[in-house]
Amino acid sequence: AKTDMENILISLGATNLGLQRTFYKSHIIAFFLNLCGIIKASLLLSPNDRLVLQYPLKKYYTWICRIAHLRNAKVITLVHDLGSFRRRKLTIPQEIKRLSNTDYIIALNSSMKKWLEEHGCQQSIGTLDIWDYLSNQISQSQHQKETKYRIIYAGTLNLRKNTFLVHFPQYINSFDLALYGNGNNLHGIDSLPHISYHGFIKSDELIASVQADFGLVWDGESLDGCTGSWGEYLKYNNPHKTSLYIRC
């Protein structure tokens, strides 16, 4: 999602002040490259610039906001995830205090906006509502009238995030469920009736090759409701895979 948003902003005339998003296995290399990008961005800011930051930005967020304000620039923060809500790496007051350094917040939806306001966020807040999904691939998916409906579920697979999948087969009779993702810790899930596991496939390959009718957005432990911290977070989050399913 962050890479897509970076490309969309550039297409709208924005300038990347730092370094383009790259991925390295070495944490040391990644740390120094991120630091170089942040220093570069800070030096290039001019008065009246609007700096868009994709949040969370780990340890550098507050520092960048302060540098931007020292240079008389405005900061717009696009929220991807709230660490205090899902991963619990921050307390809620800590996160609200951190976000108070920005001038404007783009929340994912009205529920996230309301949650931020109810917990003391006083910044102006707008909403994104749904992610754009960039891909040059053409979907080939078509439903065959003679076959059962096919549903796909994409994402990291583990008992903490999607235990509900273990209980799903007993309710499946009119459709098949295809699982895509890495970290399959749901042992034996692919041996259950009406379920197939296809491992990790890059999103562009999935769009070009998958044959399915619907995509499932659901997290948690229960089939009756999205429960647990992951399931509860869906009330406030717009999963990027929703846009992926639409793109397929």
Predicted regions and their residues:
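A short, glycine/small-residue-rich beta-strand->loop->alpha-helix junction that serves as a flexible
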Residues: 1, 27, 53, 159-161
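N-terminal subdomain of nucleotide-sugar transferases
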Residues: 1-23, 167-176
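Active-site regions of enzymes building and remodeling cell-envelope glycoconjugates
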Residues: 27-34, 69, 73, 102, ...
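Extended catalytic core of nucleotide-activated donor transferases of GT-like folds
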Residues: 28-115
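Histidine-centered beta-alpha loop that forms part of the nucleotide-sugar donor binding/catalytic region
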Residues: 55-56, 79-83, 128-132, 180-182, ...
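Donor nucleotide-sugar binding/catalytic pocket of nucleotide-sugar-dependent glycosyltransferases
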Residues: 103-117, 121-139
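Conserved catalytic-core segment of nucleotide-activated headgroup transferases in glycan assembly
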Residues: 134-208
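Nucleotide-sugar-dependent
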Residues: 210-247
